[in-house]
Design a protein with these regions (language model features):
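Periplasmic/cell-envelope proteins involved in peptidoglycan metabolism and beta-lactam response
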Residues: 1-164, 187, 262-270, 388, ...
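Beta-lactam-recognizing serine transpeptidase/beta-lactamase-like catalytic domain environment
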Residues: 90-102, 141-193, 197-400
Length: 400
């Protein structure tokens, strides 16, 4: 069982009077910020018997812990250090006679992250009263992750405890809310933030050029369903910038239906969707799903090929980021970074060392008309100036 510091000192001072007794010291992680950035940092746990058979050859001991997810897992080799020790001679009674030599231990290396502590604290605060969600703050110039928060979360120190309370254990591993799931890297319906993809499909195909004006309506019928405008009225005749500003559904239904599913799919791939982003935490990352006509023909992943054709209702849903579109918040942040930086896909990363390495790498250009990207930027600027996002801007945001 664990000894108090006082008992440990007394025992070590009188160690020569005891025989057949050994003090086992265990190194544990202490996380002073508890749940802050839990999914990013990750946790450690003891190695299993099967793991020990392999890891013992790398210097691990049977009671060692190993990183399981997040930074703790990715940078295990950098963080763990190496054990030292002392060889001693004892007599038949187990009494120490002399030291035969020592091998100094080596501490692990520091791993510096790109995370801004104040920004991370702010992201966690925003999510505090929410049932679930994720927030990512990324530098669009180079992909450095400044904040990454996921809710629900958990206290990292739980995994450092020798004896884990059953109630907390069950909450973490068996709760329907799945607090161990990193929602920043899991795929969901994106909703209205997807409308930039539909807009670019209209612009890049030339079917809906930059001067396009469309009549928005209370409702537009596709197939057997009436797809409504979110204000149930419409916004009159508007173009791209105003459509983004007010987040019009019926504007983007018309664009999406006009260009078709495969044009939207093509643009989405240029923006990095349906693929891993390259972040170090790729084992937690989901590629997501962007529908295509070929995907529908093959059975949509669950049906019989040829029996689940593409229908008009699908394109309406896809145009505004619902149902047949599943993307991760990280993918979305990367796509928006490409809009902001003039058309370059950056590699998201949390390691400061990787940030320096990426400076010498050639940037990947998405290959879209700069004028079209400018239209999207103008529309997004209007969102927070006088649109659906105006409530977050109290004059404190400097808009580029």
């Amino acid at each position: 069982d664990d000894l108090s510091i006082e008992d440990l000192i007394k025992f070590e001072e009188n160690e020569s009077f005891f025989s057949g007794i050994e003090i086992s010291k265990k190194v544990i992680r202490n996380y002073p910020y508890k749940s802050l950035g839990a999914h990013l940092i990750g946790y450690t746990s003891p190695i299993t018997d099967n793991e020990y058979k392999i890891l013992s050859k790398k210097g691990y001991r049977i009671n060692d812990v190993i990183g399981r997810i997040g930074v703790e897992y990715i940078f295990e080799n950098d963080l763990r250090g190496k054990w030292g020790g002392e060889m001693i001679e004892v007599n038949a009674a187990g009494m120490v006679q002399q030291s035969l030599g020592t091998k100094p231990s080596q501490k692990g290396n520091d791993v510096q992250l790109t995370i801004d502590l104040d920004l991370q604290l702010m992201a966690e605060e925003v999510l505090k009263d929410k049932k679930g969600g994720a927030i990512i703050a990324m530098d669009p110039r180079n992909g450095s992750i400044r904040a990454m928060a996921s809710k629900p979360t958990f206290d990292l120190n739980f995994f450092s405890k020798e004896f884990k309370p059953e109630k907390e254990f069950n909450r973490l591993f068996y709760s329907s809310s799945k607090p161990l799931l990193n929602r920043a890297l899991n795929a969901y319906d994106p909703g209205s933030v997807w409308k930039i993809v539909t807009a670019l499909a209209g612009l890049e195909t030339g079917k809906f050029p930059s001067d396009t004006l469309l009549e928005t309506q209370p409702c537009i019928t596709y197939g057997s369903q009436c797809f409504r405008e979110h204000n149930d009225l419409g916004f009159g005749e508007i173009g791209y910038v105003d459509a983004l500003r007010v987040s019009s559904n019926t504007f983007f239904y018309q664009v999406g239906y006009g260009v078709g599913v495969d044009a939207i799919n093509k643009i989405s791939k240029q923006l990095g969707f349906s693929q891993l982003t390259g972040i170090e935490l790729s084992l937690q990352e989901n590629k997501g799903l962007i529908a295509s006509s070929d995907w529908a023909k093959k059975g949509r992943g669950w049906g019989e090929p040829g029996k689940t054709p593409w229908i008009p209702e699908d394109i309406a849903s896809m145009s505004i980021g619902q149902f047949v579109v599943q993307v991760t918040p990280m993918q979305m942040a990367r796509a928006y970074a490409a809009i902001a930086n003039g058309g370059y896909l950056v590699t998201p990363h949390v390691s400061l060392a990787k940030s320096k390495d990426l400076l010498n790498q050639k940037k990947f250009k998405i290959g879209m008309n700069p004028d079209n990207l400018k239209i999207i930027r103008n529309g997004l600027r209007e969102v927070v100036r006088a649109g659906t996002g105006a409530s977050i801007n109290y004059g404190s945001l400097t808009l580029p």
